[in-house]
Amino acid sequence: MGGEILNAAILSFGLIFVGWGLGALLLKIQGGEE
């Protein structure tokens, strides 16, 4: 049970981190073009 909760927490954190990284990268690309 504990392992499942930990796995879900890591997955959620990973998705948030990836989404934040992609957003920051897109802002950098748009800022560089303009």
UniProtKB/Swiss-Prot annotation:
SUPFAM superfamilies in the record: PetM subunit of the cytochrome b6f complex
Coiled coil stretches, renumbered: none
Entry keyword set: Electron transport, Membrane, Photosynthesis, Thylakoid, Transmembrane, Transmembrane helix, Transport
GO BP annotation list: photosynthesis
Membrane topology annotation: Single-pass membrane protein
Cellular location(s): Cellular thylakoid membrane
GO cellular component terms listed in the entry, alphabetical order: cytochrome b6f complex; plasma membrane-derived thylakoid membrane
Designated name of the protein: Cytochrome b6-f complex subunit 7
Species: Nostoc punctiforme (strain ATCC 29133 / PCC 73102)
Gene from which this protein is expressed: petM
